[in-house]
Amino acid sequence: MHYSYIIKSNDKFINVRDVLKSHFLVSTRLLNKLKKSKLIYLNNVPVTPSKPVLLQNSSSAIFIHNIPVTLDSPVLPGDKVSFSMDFDEDSSNIIPIKMNLNIVYEDESFLIINKPANLAVHPTSYHFTDTLSNGVKYYFDSINLHKKIRIVNRLDRNTSGLVIIAKNEYVQ
C-alpha cells in the first residue's frame, strides 16, 4: 500500500515530518516504524533515519534542495511526499485454521467478514484455535499476506454481524 501527497503552493507544511503528521495523520509510533524501515520518500528519494555522514571522498549521501533527505528536510510546492506500508508483520502467535469465511468485501486496505454467532473474535485461553482471528490468519497466509490481524470492531462471541479487519496499521 502506497500513499503520496504533492505539496501545493498554499500548503503550510514545513518539512517531511510535518506532512506525515499533519496531512496523513501518521502516529509517532508508525512514523518511527516507517523511518526505521526506510519506507518514507521525498520526490521518490528514500528518507534516511538521520542526517547521513559523508565519508571522505564520498558522494553517497542523497540531497534534495542541497540538504540531506531526512524527516526534517524542507518541502516546497511541487514536492511529493510518500510512504509505503509494504512491510511484513509478525502474527505467529495466531495459529492458522482453515475456516469458511463469509467475506462480504475486500480491498487492499480492509477485509469485511460476516461473523456467525458462537464464534469468538480473538483467541483466549478457552478459545485458542476456534476464533475468527485463526481463520483470518489462514486466509492471509493463503494469499501470501504477512500482516497482523487488526480487528477494527469487535463482536461478542454469541453475536453475529460484520467485522472489519484492517490490513495495515495506517488504516486501522
Q: What are these model-predicted stretches?
A:
Residues 1-172:
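RNA pseudouridine synthases
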